């Protein structure tokens, strides 16, 4: 399947980046067809930056690249899920994720234990 960029007026579609191991959502960005093709070719996540109005490879300044493990396209062909391995913090603030979550298996297991205790 290929993404359908014609569904949006600006040719951009949302891209969810998820950690390949922990499954924690790292960030949300947007891609046009050129960014998608570059991401597939180079195996590093590249977005179309709406603020910079250009292609932007995550980590191009910081070195915190997102290496692509797999690319999934939703049933409507208008949203992309990329499972990636981060080379460091994902957010420009230095946080593990752009949602200020810890991206560790220990954190995930701790949250799971807390959730299970609240059900009992």
Question: What are the language-model segments listed below?
Answer:
Residues 1, 19-21, 27, 38-41:
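Hydrophobic, well-ordered secondary-structure scaffolds
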Residues 1-12:
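Short, basic/aromatic recognition patches
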Residues 10-32:
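Active-site and channel-lining beta-strand-loop segments
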Residues 21-22, 33-36, 77, 87-89:
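Short, charged/polar surface micro-motifs in flexible loops or helix N-caps
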Residues 33-47:
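A short, polar/charged loop-to-alpha-helix boundary motif
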Residues 45-108:
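Short, structured beta-strand-loop surface elements
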Residues 109-114:
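Conserved active-site carboxylates
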Residues 119:
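Conserved small/polar residues in nucleotide/adenosyl-binding loops
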């Amino acid at each position: 399947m290929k993404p359908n960029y014609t569904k949006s007026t600006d040719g951009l579609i949302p891209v969810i980046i998820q950690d390949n191991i922990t499954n924690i959502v790292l960030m949300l960005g947007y891609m046009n067809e050129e960014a998608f093709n570059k991401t597939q070719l180079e195996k590093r996540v590249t977005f179309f930056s709406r603020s910079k109005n250009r292609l932007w490879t995550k980590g191009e300044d910081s070195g915190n690249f997102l290496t692509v493990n797999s690319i999934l396209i939703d049933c409507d062909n208008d949203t992309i899920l990329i499972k990636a391995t981060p080379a460091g913090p994902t957010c420009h603030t230095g946080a593990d994720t752009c949602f200020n979550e810890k991206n560790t298996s220990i954190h995930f297991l701790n949250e799971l234990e807390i959730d299970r205790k609240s059900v009992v």
